[in-house]
UniProtKB/Swiss-Prot annotation:
Belongs to the RecR family. This is Recombination protein RecR. GO terms for biological process: DNA recombination; DNA repair. CDD domains: TOPRIM_recR. Residues 83-181 form the Toprim domain. It comes from Chlorobaculum tepidum (strain ATCC 49652 / DSM 12025 / NBRC 103806 / TLS). It comes from the Bacteria.
Length: 204
């Protein structure tokens, strides 16, 4: 059953395009927007536009940062251990590790994983930028790369690919411990488990 209003249906369809949002949830969100005050809806619309116009990727680590703050605050922080880079799939994993308060190294965000079935190859994610980043480190400061990708087939494939590229550079390549369930997404793992996984990392 579809609504007679074209505007309502259009908004439902747009909400339903979001990850994890089905039509029923999209309908509820649309009804909420309809019943909300205009000023609140305008705030939402403004926030959506701002996130596209004012958020960029850090030129060093590829994490998200505000326009005008590049490199990001993590890359420029004097308190970070610059000898270690933790490689993650998306910015949500950076936030997850930061919430633990234990990891003090740097990050590199791939923005995806290798997935041949989905047509995603190494050139479609930020692997090249990682290799170039380590290659231009003239001080030789990067000694370890921690692969913290989701425990999926795609994550494993990506980890092995990166490991093969880094080992000839003399980099110690490790992965977080296996205590995280296979198929789980790191952004939903609690802080204590993530901390133990990072502390228990092992060589590949």
């Amino acid at each position: 059953m579809r609504y007679s209003s074209g505007a309502v249906e259009a908004l439902i369809e747009e909400f339903a395009k979001l990850p994890g949002i089905g039509r029923k949830t999209a309908q509820r969100l649309t009804m909420h927007v309809l019943h909300e005050r205009r000023s609140e809806v305008e705030k939402l619309a403004s926030a959506l536009i701002d996130v596209k116009e004012k958020v960029i990727r850090c030129s060093v680590c590829q994490n998200i940062t505000d326009l005008g703050v590049d490199p990001c605050h993590i890359c420029t922080s004097a308190g970070r251990d610059r000898s270690v880079i933790c490689v993650v799939e998306s910015p949500t994993e950076v936030l997850a590790f930061e919430k633990t308060g234990h990891y003090k190294g740097l990050y590199h965000v791939l923005h995806g994983v290798i997935s041949p079935l989905d047509g995603v190859g190494p050139d479609d994610i930020k692997v090249r930028e990682l290799i170039a980043r380590i290659g231009v480190d003239s001080t030789g400061g990067v000694r370890e790369v921690v692969l913290a990708l989701n425990p999926t087939v795609e994550g494993e494939t990506t980890s092995l690919y990166i490991s093969k590229l880094l080992k000839p550079l003399g980099i110690n390549v490790t992965r977080i411990a296996r205590g995280i369930p296979v198929g789980a997404e790191l952004e939903f793992i609690d802080e204590a488990t993530l901390s133990r996984a990072m502390e228990g990392r092992s060589a590949i």
